[in-house]
From Swiss-Prot:
Name of the featured protein: Probable histone H2A.3
Post-translational modification: Not ubiquitinated.
Signal peptide region: none
Primary site of residence: nucleus
Tissue: Expressed in meristems and dividing cells.
Location in or out of the cell: Nucleus; Chromosome
Cellular component annotations (GO), alphabetically ordered: cytosol; nucleosome; nucleus
């Protein structure tokens, strides 16, 4: 049967590739799709929705990890601990707004000294003229 295309069973079986690798992501697209379907957020879930959500989550995780790594390096540490994540999130304006109501366990508080409690500068006052 010439001209009928490939016959069944001929050639090597095609290696399956994950949707994460097709999208160039590290986060699991298939697992996120399963969670979206099982969570009953909608009756149906489009094919692009889990890919987009995985990309957004991966970007946020990378952003937080980069800032937390910088905070750890500033403190001369090689391991990221919750304190570094807290410092990274609270020092970034957009992440602080996004995670404003989130409590990070073992994160501590942001260092803050009220201006009234700071020592006064000696050279800042102007000399007064007396006649």
């Amino acid at each position: 049967m010439a001209g009928r295309g490939k016959q069944l069973g001929s050639g090597a079986a095609k290696k399956s590739t994950s949707r994460s690798s097709k999208a160039g992501l590290q986060f699991p697209v298939g697992r996120i799709a399963r969670f979206l379907k099982a969570g009953k957020y909608a009756e149906r879930v489009g094919a692009g929705a889990p890919v987009y959500l995985a990309a957004v989550l991966e970007y946020l995780a990378a952003e937080v990890l980069e800032l937390a790594g910088n905070a750890a390096r500033d403190n001369k540490k090689t391991r990221i601990v919750p304190r570094h994540i807290q410092l990274a999130v609270r020092n970034d304006e957009e992440l602080s707004k996004l995670l404003g109501d989130v409590t990070i366990a073992n994160g501590g508080v942001m260092p803050n000294i009220h201006n009234l409690l700071l020592p006064k500068k000696a050279g800042s006052s102007k000399p007064t003229e007396e006649d």
